[in-house]
Regions:
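Polysaccharide-binding surfaces and accessory modules of carbohydrate-active proteins
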Residues: 4-9, 13-15, 23-226, 242
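Short acidic, Pro/Gly- and aromatic-enriched capping/linker segments at domain boundaries
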Residues: 1-6, 229-248
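Aromatic-lined carbohydrate-binding/catalytic grooves of carbohydrate-active enzymes
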Residues: 287-338
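Short Pro-Gly-centered flexible turn/kink motifs
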Residues: 12, 75, 84-89, 246-265
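Terminal connector regions
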Residues: 262-293
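Primarily single-stranded nucleic-acid-binding OB-fold modules
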Residues: 226, 231, 301-302
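Conserved, mostly hydrophobic/aromatic
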Residues: 12, 128, 251, 296, ...
Length: 338
């Protein structure tokens, strides 16, 4: 590894990753008009008053073995041993805006592969893969993706809800400690949407710097935003494992879910545009330029009165009007009697 600084760039966003001495995102924000690897040292944090002369980095895995007082990105053990791994980079592969970092801790017998991809839309994709390299099982308690956000991200927004009251936003000032979202229902729902946004206080649709994450996982999960006493802030997102649920045998590998992250300097609207473009470019499978069929849904036309003759008459009349997709909807509510 000759280079110690790597850049992922798009029209609106830059991500700078330093490798020496350990992998760390030193910048995630607006596009930098002028930057070279030699400028990486200018992004190093100064030593805070009353702190250690050597900073404890918020690495990609936020290991407690670095002396980071906070929630590490990886928690686990091998029958009480190898509980504080420190991952050292051994190889890096970069293809355009896709970076893969191979790390290991030979003392703990663990290997880690980190994938970071900055898409054309500006959405950053991150995930990790942990491999047990020893004969004894390694118990995984937590395995999270960690992203740093700057001190000016002083407000957090998340979403809650229920049936007919979905996606209700709520905001919390983030001045110290942290904000945690947990879902233990076994699936995603309106009660626990797997996303979180941190931004400058008072951010809204058209204004403010915002950093948002969405965890690509439909089971139990935990997302948190933590403010450290030295001013740094971080977002962590993970699948939530119950006691004893996840143990790696020798040679087995566990992946985190993909974390989809976005930075916008133009408020929530700019973030929405990035995620919308990302969905169209990489998630949606049908041809995006193909006109969508005109459809008719019967629910509010007939509710539970599903008479076959009447429905066929509706379908025939709808076809005459140009309807291309006819949807029979019984609502799935309490009036269903079959």
């Amino acid at each position: 590894m000759e280079e110690t600084c790597y850049r992922l760039t798009s029209n609106a966003t830059d991500v700078i990753i330093a490798l020496a001495p350990f992998p760390e995102i030193v910048y995630w924000g607006a596009h930098l008009a002028w930057f070279s690897p030699q400028d990486c040292h200018s992004l190093t944090r100064p030593v805070a008053n009353g702190r250690l002369d050597v900073d404890s980095p918020i690495t990609l895995m936020a290991e407690s073995g670095h002396g980071l007082f906070g929630a590490p990105g990886l928690e686990g053990h091998r029958n009480g041993q190898d509980a504080s791994p420190v991952f050292t980079p051994v190889r890096v592969e970069q293809q355009g805006n896709a970076l893969t970092i191979f790390c290991e801790d030979v003392n703990a017998g663990l290997g880690l592969v980190s994938e970071l991809v900055l898409t054309d839309s500006g959405v950053l994709k991150v995930r990790h893969a942990l491999t047990n390299q020893r004969a004894q099982p390694w118990q995984v308690d937590r395995f999270a993706v960690t992203l740093p956000v700057p001190e000016r991200a002083g407000e957090v927004m998340a979403f809650h809800g229920r049936w007919i009251r979905e996606f209700q936003p709520h905001r919390v000032a983030l001045s110290h400690d942290g904000f945690v979202l947990e879902n233990r229902r076994g699936r995603t729902s309106h009660e626990h949407f797997p996303a979180l946004i941190a931004g400058t206080p008072g951010f809204h649709e058209q204004q403010g710097d915002v950093w948002g994450v969405h965890l690509g996982w439909s089971g139990n999960h935990r997302i948190k935003c933590e403010a450290k006493t030295d001013g740094r802030r971080l977002i962590q997102a993970e699948a939530l494992y119950l006691p004893g649920e996840m143990a790696l045998e020798e040679g087995e590998t566990l992946h985190t879910p993909w974390l989809y992250a976005s930075f916008s300097a133009t408020g929530l609207n700019g973030m929405s545009q990035q995620f919308h473009r990302f969905l169209r470019d990489e998630i949606i499978r049908f041809p995006g330029d193909k006109p969508r069929p005109v459809h008719l849904n019967t629910w509010e036309g007939i509710y539970f009165n599903h008479d076959p003759a009447y429905i066929m008459q509706m379908a025939s009349r709808a076809a005459e009007l140009g309807v291309e997709r006819f949807i029979i909807d019984d609502g799935w509510f309490k009036g269903r009697n079959d």
